[in-house]
Amino acid sequence: MPKYPFVEEEFETVRTIIRERASISRYGDGELRCAIDGSCSSQKGDPKLAEKLRRILKNDIKGLLVGIPRSVERYDWAMYNSKKAGSWVKYRTHRFGSLLDPSKKYYSSFITRSDNAFHINCKQYWDLCKVMWDKRNVVFIQGEEKPIAKTKDLFGNISSSKIIIGPSHHAFDEYEKIKNEAKKHYEKNVLFILALGAAATVLACDIHLDGYQALDLGHMGAFYGNIFKEKPGLEKIEKEAISNDQIYNKELYK
């Protein structure tokens, strides 16, 4: 079995993003399946997507963190969801291990998943997360069905926000449209927060290469809302899917 590389823990992953104003591309089980020419529930297989995902896993791009699952052998799984341990072991086999650079330092993809990392289920952790976007002009790029931006308390400390709505399923099919829409918002102090499945993993890298910070934070809003029982705090939004060649941009908070 290939040697599993070092993966930084969740608190330190967030601290690194804050300290270095780094971007992050994250891999969960769906992205890993897509990287080996497979598919997942939200994204059908695509050779171009698979190639991009594989390349990012071994990249040496300054300021871009790559998040992967933590090893079930290297770390104390009392802090994690042991029910999923078998799943990560499967991806450590020849199907997945060969995609990684054993000498590269990786970061945790569990930073948004308190169902995987039980110890981040605390106010201290979520307060730390809020520092990542404190007083920033945020552009959310998200799917229509599970909008990360709906958790108003989580993002209540940002300066301004706009939203780009993409497809909740098979978003990579509309990748160029989504990326071109993101480029319209390139400006000083902008931060992109992405929740768009496997498409977000590669989009975070592309936005970073253009010189802007991008955080792939899918599932974060849902788990924060579950923990703090937050109800959606936004007014009703009329959304148009990007697949219909219409993008919806709106100030969410003032």
Residue ranges and their predicted role:
Residues M1-F155:
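Electropositive, gly/pro-rich neighborhoods at or near active sites that engage anionic ligands
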Residues P2-V7, T16, P47, K62-L64, ...:
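Catalytic phosphate/metal-binding cores of nucleic-acid and nucleotide-processing enzymes, i.e., regions
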Residues E8-E10, K48-R55, D173-K184, V190, ...:
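A short, acidic, amphipathic alpha-helical segment used as a generic capping/interface helix at domain edges
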Residues R70, I165, G218:
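Residues at the C-termini of beta-strands that transition into short coil/loop
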Residues N137, V190-L191:
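Structural motif
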Residues E145-N189:
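A mid-sequence, solvent-exposed acidic-amphipathic segment
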Residues A199-K254:
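C-terminal functional extensions of proteins
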